[in-house]
Structures are given as structure tokens and as C-alpha cells.
């Protein structure tokens, strides 16, 4: 069985498959992805494969510089996005935006 390259919490799977979630915001541990990368995507909870994505762009962001556009690309409000990022990465300040499309 082939390993997954990136995982998402299961709660985001439907939004990714429907094209409602088109970015992911990660910490430095996952800052190595670059435009053109094709990634196998799995669920964080069980590592089950559910789609393949292509990275279309990358950029850096801080919690304070997140915008409404980031929130729309995550299919959340800006307040929800800031809370989710703070919950997943407590104490972190520098993040990496990975824009993608499903293949």
C-alpha cells in the first residue's frame, strides 16, 4: 500500500472533495511542499486515502495576517479559522499556506 503524503482531519474530507476547501495552513514541519507537487491525501484519524491533490501555490502567513479570503478558501469564517489554527498549533505564530486543487 502506498503511503499518504499529507493528512487532514476527517471533518474536512467532504469540503475538500466538494472543492469548498482549497487551502491548508500548516506549521514549519510541513513547509516543504511546493507548487507542482502531487500529493496522496489521507485522513489524520486512520490514514485512509481519500483523494489526490496538486499544490498550486504556497505562501507564508501569521495568525494576525489571516484574511477573509483565507477563511473562504478554508470554508470557514475568519474567527473560526483563527480558532482552529490556534487549537491545532498552540503557541505557533508562523504558518505556511498550501493552495491546492483536487485531481
Curated annotation (Swiss-Prot):
It catalyses: N(4)-acetylcytidine + H2O = cytidine + acetate + H(+); N(4)-acetyl-2'-deoxycytidine + H2O = 2'-deoxycytidine + acetate + H(+); N(4)-acetylcytosine + H2O = cytosine + acetate + H(+). One of its GO terms (molecular function) is N4-acetylcytidine amidohydrolase activity. Residues 6-100 form the ASCH domain. Its EC number is 3.5.1.135. The active site is at 21 (proton acceptor), 24 (nucleophile), 74 (proton donor). Keywords: Hydrolase. SUPFAM superfamilies: PUA domain-like (SSF88697). InterPro entries: AC4CH, ASCH_domain, PUA-like_sf. Gene3D superfamilies: Hypothetical protein. GO terms for cellular component: cytosol. Catalyzes the hydrolysis of N(4)-acetylcytidine (ac4C). PANTHER family: UCP029143 FAMILY PROTEIN. Belongs to the N(4)-acetylcytidine amidohydrolase family. This is N(4)-acetylcytidine amidohydrolase. It comes from Klebsiella pneumoniae subsp. pneumoniae (strain ATCC 700721 / MGH 78578). The lineage of its organism: Bacteria, Pseudomonadati, Pseudomonadota, Gammaproteobacteria, Enterobacterales.
